[in-house]
């Protein structure tokens, strides 16, 4: 009994600080267009976020639903990640209402008949710049011949402050053939510059807004996106 009591005390000593550090994040963005890594995924959308983090670990849920075009694909992403001293790793489960399963069932995970895509990622933030690599390893990601595509994406990003706003410049590329990104080999799909700032509405309330210019050299498309955060 004494040993059991000692073990319980040790567990409580470890868990209590972790409980004190648990943080919950709730928010939402409204965007004029849904652009993902240089690829258009839909028109204006509402994108809510729910995240819980503690001790470098984070579990999050992120969604997107069209608010103008009812034909836009709905999306629900679940991510589990760990960050330590600038380094981060994680896995994301992307689910789309359209895909290999014509019924759009969430709990259908069979590889060749699912609307899920599982992606692993790793990155490092140097402070003045960051680099991230993402690779799909399971789900609805196939080449035209039916083989697995293992679609991958790499992004370099650099934040800076200027002209009363917080800016981020980014360059992203796809290293190999990927129908998901619309490439048949190495291609730059994302060159973007985004500015974010808070607009004061009243003395006690400010509205965070962002505007970003994104160019996709691979698809020869360009987008100007407005975002509002809550």
Residue ranges, per PLM feature:
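Cleavable N-terminal export/targeting peptides
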Residues: 1-23
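Outer-membrane beta-barrel translocator domains and adjoining extracellular loop/strand segments
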Residues: 38-43, 71-77, 100-109, 140-148, ...
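Residues that define the transmembrane beta-barrel architecture of outer-membrane proteins
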Residues: 22, 42-46, 72-76, 83, ...
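Surface-exposed loop and membrane-interface regions of Gram-negative outer-membrane beta-barrel proteins
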Residues: 57-83, 88-112
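Outer-membrane beta-barrel "beta-signal"
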Residues: 193, 199, 219-230
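Short loop/turn motifs that connect adjacent beta-strands in outer-membrane beta-barrel proteins
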Residues: 19-23, 86, 90, 159-168, ...
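Detector for outer-membrane/organellar transmembrane beta-barrel domains
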Residues: 108-179
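Transmembrane beta-strands of outer-membrane beta-barrel proteins
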Residues: 25-31, 51, 60-64, 81, ...
